[in-house]
């Protein structure tokens, strides 16, 4: 990943930005999902299945390689999700070359879903040191496009994706009956979605509703239950029952009237109850499949990757090196710059941290026609701040030439305690935060624990050796 990169136009370079088409619906459609009750294997069990046969979740200790530019396994520390090659460097957010030679200092211990940990061990040289626990399920199911046999969640996805496609209207090029028939056959062949041609008409409201159903459905499986709850109490006895209940922690009492009291309480973790819709395994598998899908695309571009988000990749396109393939089906990649600007390519890319980046686009491929886009989480760019939130200011912060900026946010709508909504003036500090990878010269970054000599560091090393020789003379 790059903190800053400028495309070399003389060499034919471009910066391309692509996004996965309906990432989570696509993994709900095609991903393998476990079913049944798990058989739990504990450490030392000789009957434990081999790594290629795992299908559930695994608690293990692994040592990452030291030369993997794009790590596979996530590791949470300091309230952040890192992708490190060294645990100690990630926990301290080290900015220097890793010096931890002892595997005990570098190893990661955690719980991962089977698709992710199998990718790490079988394809990316992670060393499996110890398996503490394996949840092995009865089997896996997935959608079969040839037989149209549904998997665990594919029937739901096909239903609402058909509604979304129909509410989007016919795509460009479907001007004849033959073109429409070919389009419907193509969607059925690759996505298993049956389109009713009599219902294909633009309906923005229905499209938005079906999109919401597709993207939010799987989240119900992982809904958090250990959160505050509010009740209204009308007599002293009810209040005392709530206060002395060992399963509840009363957090707030708010008198609403002489006869009514609003009580906010939180369940004790040991007494947490599962919801009828909860299935933590399937929520975890959905995000896992999404990360693996994105990783496959990142792996194709390697160190040409400039930036990645949950479902998007920015990378350097060079003559003679393969570009990421584009498509229109679920899980394929779409050209994000082309969708926003038409035929265009990015010239510069700046990364200030997660959801904090900017890029310049040559519209129509003409460097004289440049448009600038800046995305900053928590800041809506309008007339009140567009003179501060600029490409030049972001570049200055990325290059360490200026301090963080305070951005005014006038008339922000905010919720405050007591169920009140207010409008107030506030501000946000805009700053660069690159703490999940180690910054090296020229704007490049590498994972924490990456020890393979990088060209810029090698040049620095050679310069230091030459200076040392001169001083010794």
Predicted regions and their residues:
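Conserved acidic
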Residues: 1-473
